[in-house]
């Protein structure tokens, strides 16, 4: 079976990210041969962060991507930054027993700090605020998930509130 690759596009998907991005940014296709010390494939969060950190040791860093920076799934998230994982707590504890779980949670927390540190260090023009987040869900499985995580974070001294439907509607300003 042969796979025909899809043509790369420079069109952004319809998203909050696209709607609020600097319209003046447009990156063309790489059409010439280049040499570099470090080539990074992918201009999502991981690729861009790798490039930023690599430039602390070398100036010769090139990033390539089949589309615009941030085009992929990480670029469509609307800008939320919070130390959350979509797996249930017990599943993660099974995957990362003992100290591995604690290290995993610390990595989640450190990742949030890193985002805000980079924004400050490089004076990124954005409206970054550390003001919490709402993680919504519907149904018994989602309620169990949210309850487990809210109890976990509260146990670590975080300010966490489990909201019902009415309180969530009040906080976000809509019932939809």
Q: Which residues fall in each region the model found?
A:
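Conserved N-terminal glycine-rich FAD pyrophosphate-binding loop of Rossmann-like flavoproteins
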Residues: 67-103
């Amino acid at each position: 079976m042969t796979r025909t690759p899809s043509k790369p596009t420079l069109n952004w998907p319809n998203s909050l990210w696209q709607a609020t991005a600097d319209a003046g940014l447009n990156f063309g296709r790489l059409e010439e041969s280049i040499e570099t010390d470090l080539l990074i494939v992918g201009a999502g969060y991981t690729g861009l962060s790798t490039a930023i950190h690599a430039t602390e040791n070398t100036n010769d860093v090139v990033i390539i991507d089949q589309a615009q920076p941030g085009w992929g799934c990480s670029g469509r998230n609307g800008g939320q930054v919070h130390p959350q994982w979509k797996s249930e707590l017990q599943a993660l504890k099974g995957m990362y027993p003992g100290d591995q779980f604690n290290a995993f949670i610390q990595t989640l927390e450190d990742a949030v700090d890193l985002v805000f540190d980079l924004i400050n260090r490089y004076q990124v023009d954005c409206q970054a605020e550390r003001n919490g987040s709402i993680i919504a869900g519907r149904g018994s499985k989602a309620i169990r998930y949210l309850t487990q995580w809210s109890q976990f974070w509260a146990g670590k001294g975080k300010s966490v509130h489990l909201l019902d439907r009415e309180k969530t509607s009040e906080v976000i300003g809509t019932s939809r």
